[in-house]
């Protein structure tokens, strides 16, 4: 009897294992059968969910880009169909002195607004991230210019730049200095626009830096204090390197904004005097809707798109892999 019980137990175990194996094989076979019997719409359903967004993206992004590139190879005639001219519009663009002037203006505008607004945003974020009295009010004051429409910002700054009656000339008058036409002088108009855009954009970029600073573990600063590191050394060696991904994101947004902001030109200067304040996008607007030269405007648009694509490639293809920390 002592040897019979283990034998019976073993046979029962082997029998149960065989049953489990058969059940598993039957279950797998059932899954394969159900997978083969799965209706076609189950595979198509995810694509149907993506279809509305894909249609909108193709209609309002991809098609306009292709249509713009296509239009650059033609010229329109008043009483006839469009005439194919090949690369003539591109040759005319490179021979156009106004194009080179507005491109230079845009470069000066970008170099003036991008680094200054980023540096100011970083300083403001570090300041409002500390424990100080009225911190909420200070944050609101820094961010308020961002929520104002560009048209409103332009009108506010016209109050500063108006000759003789503006705030700047009123302050100059206190020192016996004559009035100055800030927006009518080729040497000062671009600087005036740069200051205004920095005032508007710095608060927007500050939000990203503030969010990044609040995500940094406080143990880093405590460890640096224990080691005797000063605030400047801690910022240069720890804080700023950890903020580089945020700086890259803010930088690419600043580059895009430097080429797409033209609302203030319509209100303040209309590109003058003598195209001294005209930017590339505003020149495209003038060519398309004032001079009614749509093919040449399309050619300028392709050039603007190419500049932004190069900036994006530098960002995603080169800088991303060198400054992100895992």
PLM regions with names:
Residues 1-13, 19-50, 132-135, 314-326:
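Transmembrane alpha-helical segments of polytopic membrane transport and secretion proteins
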């Amino acid at each position: 009897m002592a040897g019979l019980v283990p034998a019976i137990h073993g046979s029962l175990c082997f029998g149960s294992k065989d049953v489990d194996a058969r059940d598993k094989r039957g279950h797998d076979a059932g899954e394969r059968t159900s997978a083969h019997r799965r209706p076609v719409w189950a595979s198509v359903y995810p694509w149907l969910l993506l279809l509305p967004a894909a249609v909108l993206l193709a209609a309002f992004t991809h098609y306009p880009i292709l249509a713009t590139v296509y239009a650059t190879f033609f010229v329109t005639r008043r009483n006839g169909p469009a005439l194919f001219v090949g690369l003539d519009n591109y040759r005319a663009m490179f021979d156009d002195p106004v194009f080179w002037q507005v491109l230079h203006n845009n470069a000066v505008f970008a170099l003036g607004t991008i680094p200054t607004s980023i540096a100011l945003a970083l300083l403001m974020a570090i300041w409002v991230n500390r424990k100080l009295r009225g911190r909420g009010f200070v944050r609101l004051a820094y961010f308020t210019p961002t929520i104002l429409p560009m048209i409103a910002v332009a009108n506010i700054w016209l109050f500063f730049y108006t000759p003789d009656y503006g705030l700047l000339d009123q302050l100059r008058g206190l020192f016996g200095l004559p009035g100055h036409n800030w927006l009518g002088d080729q040497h000062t108009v671009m600087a005036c626009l740069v200051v205004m855009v920095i005032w508007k954009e710095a608060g927007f970029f500050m939000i990203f830096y503030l969010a990044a600073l609040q995500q940094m573990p406080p143990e880093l600063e405590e460890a640096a204090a224990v080691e005797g590191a000063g605030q400047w050394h801690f910022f240069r060696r720890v804080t700023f390197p950890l903020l580089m991904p945020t700086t890259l994101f803010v930088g690419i947004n600043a580059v895009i904004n430097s080429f797409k902001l033209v609302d203030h030109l319509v209100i303040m200067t209309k590109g003058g005097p003598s195209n001294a304040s005209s930017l590339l996008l505003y020149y495209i607007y003038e060519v398309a809707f004032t001079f009614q030269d749509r093919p040449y405007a399309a050619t300028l648009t392709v050039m603007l798109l190419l500049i932004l694509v190069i900036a994006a490639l530098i960002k995603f293809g080169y800088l991303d892999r060198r400054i992100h920390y895992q």
